[in-house]
Amino acid sequence: MAAADGDDSLYPIAVLIDELRNEDVQLRLNSIKKLSTIALALGVERTRSELLPFLTDTIYDEDEVLLALAEQLGTFTTLVGGPEYVHCLLPPLESLATVEETVVRDKAVESLRAISHEHSPSDLEAHFVPLVKRLAGGDWFTSRTSACGLFSVCYPRVSSAVKAELRQYFRNLCSDDTPMVRRAAASKLGEFAKVLELDNVKSEIIPMFSNLASDEQDSVRLLAVEACVNIAQLLPQEDLEALVMPTLRQAAEDKSWRVRYMVADKFTELQKAVGPEITKTDLVPAFQNLMKDCEAEVRAAASHKVKEFCENLSADCRENVIMSQILPCIKELVSDANQHVKSALASVIMGLSPILGKDNTIEHLLPLFLAQLKDECPEVRLNIISNLDCVNEVIGIRQLSQSLLPAIVELAEDAKWRVRLAIIEYMPLLAGQLGVEFFDEKLNSLCMAWLVDHVYAIREAATSNLKKLVEKFGKEWAHATIIPKVLAMSGDPNYLHRMTTLFCINVLSEVCGQDITTKHMLPTVLRMAGDPVANVRFNVAKSLQKIGPILDNSTLQSEVKPILEKLTQDQDVDVKYFAQEALTVLSLA
């Protein structure tokens, strides 16, 4: 296959072809990735007659190389001469669809599915369907698994006799001895059902579905639950009760929690597929059971779906069903022993406010929100605080502040400093949701109180919190509201609080810009250079180094430099050191 020596233009191609045989896997991989270049150079005839047979014969390679090959072949139609020759790509892909490595098989199936659309109906019957049958009847489970993904792409365009054969082959795969094959069939059942005629769905797909849904392996049963969504969408309402619901009821009470989890996970899709009547009679009780399930994973999956499930209930019975059947379960979940369950619920529970309206929210939901705000799990608290806006829209800021704000203030003053820290971290989020006026009235004093907390980590977090608030509300707000209070602390008798002033100025200067920093904050820093406590004085030097780049040169020369030079003569070694460092960094030395 190597190109003739005399033809220089083909030399790189000869190299690439030789590399396909090279012992070094990296070289083989590079060559496979350039396969389209080789094919272009060889032309369509030689690609069909030489390259493809060569590739088909050498499919015993590293998985990485095979994966690249399976991917490349899916885009090869034009390189073999277009749709009339596309069947030439089937032999190498068929071999790849039988290898042991799942990733390679899946990629080969993906490429086969892609090129199936380029076959004419007669080519499908002559070339593609025989391949599907060979794979489906293969000795190794690997080939039978691959076959499952190929039925739905060829079924719609073949004759009714061939369709009947394909349905028979698929039925065999659904009852295969190997669980892996039944699993593959179950995962493709919904997709196959979509391309079948309605009568065949009822007469053939439903029995397969029922069998798979009662398979001895839970991994097969849970995939049947996924298929249930697709199948239910295809059937007319009057057939659902007899054909799908018995199986679905059985799955919702399956002995394996993984199957029940899958039901909970797909619950709102099932709800849309079966419609409002069956939802009311069947799914509401099933949902109650899932919310009370003994397995935490199942309760968490159901909790995630609470809001969406309630939204999808039909309007005439929605409020009644939620209040009488769903809310009692939610109340229990709020104090669940498992934090994943509580967190899942907290992420969606606020969404019930718009559904239930103002009065119900105030009477029934606010007590639950309050309980969650006080939960020991930070995830739960965060999920409530981050969704306050949708409650705010329903009940208004005043009502919200009367009920939830005391709880937030209580947490902000909690004896455990880690709880205080958590609330500080939520503060910018809260401020954004509640707006500037409300913040100034209710929360500003809290934020200032944290700056003088006795725990350093709180003071530090409160400082960076101020910066985030200024980013939200703007520097004019900072100038009017925050800066005066921060500067007032510079005269505090406690030197730790005086130092906090400097730390705040360090971060505020970044967001407030040159003008406010120079006019309002710098004078305080310079004045503090005369503080009796050395710790404060060396922090003045550090602050000047930090805010120096924001100031203009004349200010640096006339105001900052003299103070730093004075500090280099200080009797304290640390003060001297930091003053000298600041002069050097600001190029004033």
Curated annotation (Swiss-Prot):
Give GO terms: molecular function aspect only.
Answer: protein antigen binding; protein heterodimerization activity; protein phosphatase regulator activity; protein serine/threonine phosphatase activity
Q: What is known of its domains?
A: Each HEAT repeat appears to consist of two alpha helices joined by a hydrophilic region, the intrarepeat loop. The repeat units may be arranged laterally to form a rod-like structure.
Q: Which residues carry this modification: N-acetylalanine?
A: A2
- GO terms (BP aspect): chromosome segregation; female meiotic nuclear division; intracellular signal transduction; meiotic sister chromatid cohesion, centromeric; meiotic spindle elongation; mitotic sister chromatid separation; negative regulation of hippo signaling; negative regulation of phosphatidylinositol 3-kinase/protein kinase B signal transduction
This protein is called Serine/threonine-protein phosphatase 2A 65 kDa regulatory subunit A alpha isoform
Disease cited in the entry: Houge-Janssens syndrome 2: An autosomal dominant disorder characterized by global developmental delay, hypotonia, variably impaired intellectual development, poor speech, and dysmorphic facial features. Some patients may develop seizures.
Lineage of source species: Eukaryota, Metazoa, Chordata, Craniata, Vertebrata
Family annotation (InterPro entries): ARM-like, ARM-type_fold, HEAT, HEAT_type_2, PP2A/SF3B1-like_HEAT, PP2A_Regulatory_Subunit_A
Source taxon at top rank: Eukaryota
Q: Where is this region: PP2A subunit C binding?
A: 400-589
Self-association or partners: how does it assemble? PP2A consists of a common heterodimeric core enzyme, composed of PPP2CA a 36 kDa catalytic subunit (subunit C) and PPP2R1A a 65 kDa constant regulatory subunit (PR65 or subunit A), that associates with a variety of regulatory subunits. Proteins that associate with the core dimer include three families of regulatory subunits B (the R2/B/PR55/B55, R3/B''/PR72/PR130/PR59 and R5/B'/B56 families), the 48 kDa variable regulatory subunit, viral proteins, and cell signaling molecules. Found in a complex with at least ARL2, PPP2CB, PPP2R1A, PPP2R2A, PPP2R5E and TBCD.
Q: Where are the HEAT repeats?
A: 8-46, 47-84, 85-123, 124-161, 162-200, 201-239, 240-278, 279-321, 322-360, 361-399, 400-438, 439-477, 478-516, 517-555, 556-589
Q: Which compartments does it reside in?
A: Cytoplasm; Nucleus; Chromosome; Chromosome, Centromere
Decide whether keyword Cell membrane is in the record: yes
Which portions of the sequence form the region PP2A subunit B binding?
8-399
Q: Where is this region: Polyoma small and medium T antigens Binding?
A: 47-321
* Gene that encodes it: PPP2R1A
